[in-house]
């Protein structure tokens, strides 16, 4: 198994410096990760830094709270793509889901999907804040709205990916969508377990350590 192709090599910290982003890009080129995931302000820089490789540029929308309006999320998406983003990881409107406003949750996702054109859209459900029933419902809404993938976590809330959540999400969406486990893989064994549970992507800042068989520090 080429585990490197499952990994979105991630640096989303608000205090990330250019030299840290450059290090992320260098590691992505060396290890051939599926993508780098960076904040929107770094998309254009990342695109230039990955020219000549097959590493995708992934960025985040409505991040990390998901509480911006759908119009803002759509604008963020369009601008990110103009700047070179290949993949969009958007955060759902968690408050709307918790309030039972499923129409808003779905239309919010759909706004990003429509703004993305042919680019990959992953929907962050922030599983640590949801009941199992809410996880099932929002995965179904993401599927209905035309998203490509559902993702467990932002890495900025109360918890990251769990095997139970990845399993439930995979069972809910079937084989038609991707499932991204984010914020829970600290070792090669962790990453492998997520893949075996149904993950097609793993979001982590510890991709290099994972591939080296080391135990990584940190929380994403």
UniProtKB/Swiss-Prot annotation:
Among its keywords, does the record have Lyase? yes
Q: CDD domains, per this entry? A: DeoC
Q: Where this protein primarily resides, as one coarse class?
A: cytoplasm
Spell out the GO cellular component terms annotated for this protein, sorted alphabetically and separated by semicolons: cytoplasm
Report the EC number(s), separated by commas if there are several. Answer: 4.1.2.4
Query: Which catalytic residues are annotated?
Result: 89 (proton donor/acceptor), 151 (schiff-base intermediate with acetaldehyde), 180 (proton donor/acceptor)
**One GO MF term:** deoxyribose-phosphate aldolase activity
Q: Which Gene3D superfamilies does UniProt cross-reference here?
A: Aldolase class I (3.20.20.70)
Gene Ontology biological process terms in this record = 2-deoxyribose 1-phosphate catabolic process; carbohydrate catabolic process; deoxyribonucleotide catabolic process
What's the catalysed reaction?
2-deoxy-D-ribose 5-phosphate = D-glyceraldehyde 3-phosphate + acetaldehyde
The entry's keywords: Cytoplasm, Lyase, Schiff base
Q: Where in the cell is it found?
A: Cytoplasm
Known pathway: Carbohydrate degradation; 2-deoxy-D-ribose 1-phosphate degradation; D-glyceraldehyde 3-phosphate and acetaldehyde from 2-deoxy-alpha-D-ribose 1-phosphate: step 2/2
- Function of the protein: Catalyzes a reversible aldol reaction between acetaldehyde and D-glyceraldehyde 3-phosphate to generate 2-deoxy-D-ribose 5-phosphate.
Q: PANTHER family, alphabetically?
A: DEOXYRIBOSE-PHOSPHATE ALDOLASE
| Record's protein name | Deoxyribose-phosphate aldolase
Report the gene name.
deoC
């Amino acid at each position: 198994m080429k585990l490197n192709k499952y990994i979105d090599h991630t640096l989303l910290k608000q205090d990330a410096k250019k030299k840290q982003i450059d290090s992320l890009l260098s590691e992505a080129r060396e290890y051939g990760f599926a993508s780098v995931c960076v904040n929107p302000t770094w998309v254009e820089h990342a695109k230039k830094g990955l020219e000549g490789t097959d590493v995708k540029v992934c960025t985040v929308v409505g991040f990390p709270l998901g509480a911006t309006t759908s119009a803002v999320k759509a604008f963020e998406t369009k601008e990110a793509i103009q700047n070179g983003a290949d993949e969009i990881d958007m955060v759902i409107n968690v408050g709307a889901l918790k309030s039972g406003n499923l129409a808003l949750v779905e239309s919010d996702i759909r706004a990003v999907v429509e703004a993305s054109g042919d680019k990959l859209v992953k929907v962050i459900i922030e599983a640590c804040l949801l009941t199992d029933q809410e996880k099932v419902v929002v995965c179904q809404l993401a599927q209905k709205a035309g998203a490509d993938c559902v993702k467990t976590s932002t890495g900025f809330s109360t918890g990251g990916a769990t095997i139970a959540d990845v399993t439930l999400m995979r069972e809910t969406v079937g084989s038609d969508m991707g499932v991204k486990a984010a914020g829970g893989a600290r070792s090669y064994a962790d990453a492998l377990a997520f893949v075996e549970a149904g993950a097609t992507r793993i979001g982590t800042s510890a991709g290099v350590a994972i591939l080296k068989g080391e135990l990584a520090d940190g929380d994403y």
